């Protein structure tokens, strides 16, 4: 077949595919307009840097897992707050029935506009998530947690009944359906997960996450959250030093670690992580226990230096700008990648497609 004939045959095939499956079903890679990754900040500057693209990528699945009381829900709620600050809509599927509105509000979440669901079964929770995402009106949905998405058969059965692999099959089926919709609507889907231990493992890591392997495969970013040490002052425990490891990353190099302070009742200490990041890049000098900025001492000891930054917003802002530039996560580049108008147009297109599909099914 000659070159011109091949081109004509390919064009005819592409037109046929577009006619049958709709515009955009197939395209040349160079034709795609939104080649850059659109992101939303995580609420932690250190985590933005660790993920490598300045925040959570839109239209992707994120898994946040770790031991109990390590800070998983706090990490997710900070993401919800960041989305709402930018005028987005957030949904929270509280399968654990443990949502604390007062704590969420302290982290900056607008609880009046937050869409909350406390489903009775795993099927109900995932169906609600699917319906919300398919609407094209949700910017972020958090499922807390995968381990609490109990299949209906287990809820209705007797205590002690064996339901081998039921939750894994449920998650596998749900993610097959959700992944495409999440991508089209540019929704960030955060799945919080717990840790279990495999029985009889002698060598290697015995820890695993419930819900089967599907979530591991479909996740673009997987974050492991672990407590490192307690933060104490004058004998009182104020919070925990937490390590967030990027164990999987499809948008940037993985295995980077963000260390943050999670303070009781306040969430992630942004002044603390800013101080650490600035000290690492020599923006703030550290000599012994003293911290200095441009030859001016700002505090003896980490907690005093943090307090100084919080009490001097002008210096805080200057240091933050320098840190963003040093780590390549300045807000302008993130805003350029987000391109809100394109995201809005894409959502409207998806919403119209869903309406058309539903009307055709009704006929």
Curated annotation (Swiss-Prot):
One of its GO terms (cellular component) is cytosol. ATP binds at residues 66-73. Gene3D superfamilies: P-loop containing nucleotide triphosphate hydrolases (3.40.50.300). Residues 327-363 are annotated as: Disordered. Signal peptide: none annotated. It is found in: Cytoplasm. One of its GO terms (molecular function) is ATP-dependent DNA damage sensor activity. Residues 329-363 have a biased composition (Basic and acidic residues). Its main location: cytoplasm. Keywords: ATP-binding, Cytoplasm, DNA damage, DNA recombination, DNA repair, DNA-binding, Nucleotide-binding, SOS response. PROSITE patterns: RECA_1, RECA_2, RECA_3. InterPro entries: AAA+_ATPase (IPR003593), DNA_recomb/repair_RecA (IPR013765), DNA_recomb/repair_RecA_CS (IPR020584), P-loop_NTPase (IPR027417), RecA-like_C (IPR049261), RecA-like_N (IPR049428), RecA_ATP-bd (IPR020588), RecA_C_sf (IPR023400). GO terms for biological process: DNA recombination; DNA repair; SOS response. It comes from the Bacteria. PANTHER family: MITOCHONDRIAL DNA REPAIR PROTEIN RECA HOMOLOG-RELATED (PTHR45900:SF1), RECA (PTHR45900). Can catalyze the hydrolysis of ATP in the presence of single-stranded DNA, the ATP-dependent uptake of single-stranded DNA by duplex DNA, and the ATP-dependent hybridization of homologous single-stranded DNAs. It interacts with LexA causing its activation and leading to its autocatalytic cleavage. NCBIfam families: tigrfam_recA. Belongs to the RecA family. HAMAP family: RecA. This is Protein RecA.
């Amino acid at each position: 077949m000659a070159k011109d004939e091949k081109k004509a045959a390919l064009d005819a095939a592409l037109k046929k595919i577009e006619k049958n499956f709709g515009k955009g079903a197939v395209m040349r890679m160079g034709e795609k307009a939104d080649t850059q990754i659109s992101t939303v900040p995580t609420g932690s500057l250190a985590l933005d840097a660790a993920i490598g693209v300045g925040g959570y990528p839109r239209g992707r699945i994120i898994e946040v897992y770790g031991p109990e009381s390590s800070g998983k829900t706090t990490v997710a709620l900070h993401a919800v707050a960041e989305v709402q600050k930018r005028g987005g809509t957030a949904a929270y599927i509280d399968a654990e029935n443990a949502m604390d509105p007062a704590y969420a509000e302290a982290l900056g979440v607008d609880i009046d506009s937050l869409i909350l669901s406390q489903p009775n079964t795993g099927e109900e929770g995932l169906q609600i998530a699917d319906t919300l995402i398919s609407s094209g009106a949700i910017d972020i949905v958090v499922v807390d947690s995968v381990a609490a998405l109990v299949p209906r058969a287990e809820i209705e059965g007797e205590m002690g009944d064996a339901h081998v692999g039921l939750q894994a099959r449920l998650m596998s089926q749900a993610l097959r359906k959700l992944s495409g919709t999440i991508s089209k609507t540019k929704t960030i889907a955060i799945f919080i997960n717990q840790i279990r231990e495999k029985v009889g493992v002698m060598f290697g890591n015995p820890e695993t996450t419930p819900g089967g392997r599907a979530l591991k495969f479909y996740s673009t970013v997987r974050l492991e959250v672990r407590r490192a040490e307690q933060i104490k002052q004058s004998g009182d425990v104020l919070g925990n030093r937490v390590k967030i490891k990027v164990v999987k990353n499809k948008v940037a190099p993985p295995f980077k670690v963000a260390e943050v302070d999670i303070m009781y009742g306040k969430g992630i200490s942004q002044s603390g992580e800013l101080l650490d990041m600035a000290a690492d890049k020599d923006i703030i000098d550290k000599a012994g226990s003293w911290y200095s900025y441009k030859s001016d001492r700002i505090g003896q000891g980490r907690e005093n230096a943090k307090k100084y930054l919080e009490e001097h917003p002008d210096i805080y802002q200057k240091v933050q700008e320098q840190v963003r530039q040093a780590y390549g996560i300045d807000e302008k580049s993130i805003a350029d990648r987000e391109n809100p108008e394109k995201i809005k147009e894409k959502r409207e297109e998806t919403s119209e497609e869903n309406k058309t599909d539903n009307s055709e099914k009704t006929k």
